[in-house]
Amino acid sequence: MKTMNYIKIGIASSILSIAAGCTSFLEEDLKSSLAPDNTYTSSLGFEVGATGLYAIARSEYNTWGENGAFMHNGACAYEVLQISTDLCRMGTVRDGSLVPFAEMTLNPSTLFVGSYWNWAYNLIASANELLIYSEKNDNWDYPTDKQLYQAEARFFRAYAYRTLVYLYGDVPWVETIQKPFLLSFSRDPKIEVQGNIIKDLEFAKTYLPDNPDNVKEGKLTTWAARHLLSEMYLLRGAEGDYKLAEENAQDVIDCPYYSLMKSRFGNAK
């Protein structure tokens, strides 16, 4: 009988010890997958996040849907913005994705409308996430890393909103991570969104590097931000904006790292 009691006590003790360890056992310790909480903890993690922004931005030109691109069987923004103007016209081979823009028959069911909206807000959400976590992190390789990655993120957020205001006019300006998930956004006036775009680009202009030889190939420099700033000041057209557009454009023209093309290239040179 005593033996049976000892067994029961042993079983009960085991159950209690298992129950006590359940909490720690169930805590997630991610070792083989990336999430913001275990990625944005160092300069290397922010480099990973910034690389993702470049990938999303470049997917804009993957117009035929390869590898899960956001654009599906459609034209890029530059084509649709020009096709109904005197800059270009559709050839004898009619691109179905351009027809609604060329003939002014665009409607909410046009695939391009949803795909470009999704592309832009995916880039914006990813940039916002990097920016928010950069304010929480204090583990940087160099004191300038925080502002550098913030500059890249703010450039891409501005770039996405630039496309949105061209295509849709008034759009929701979002700079937070929505928790809980939110669908009921309100559109902000285009003039306000343009002001926010300019603020982002002014920040990027200040903290992006100026020498392209000191960054990895394809990485942003201050000159990209200045080029886009010139365009955005022209687009907004408020008092003093044309002068600022000229100044930023002149900075790019005069910079020692780039030059205007002065001769033809290829077979027609």
Spans of model-derived segments:
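Conserved, well-structured interaction surfaces
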Residues: 47, 55-65, 89-168, 184, ...
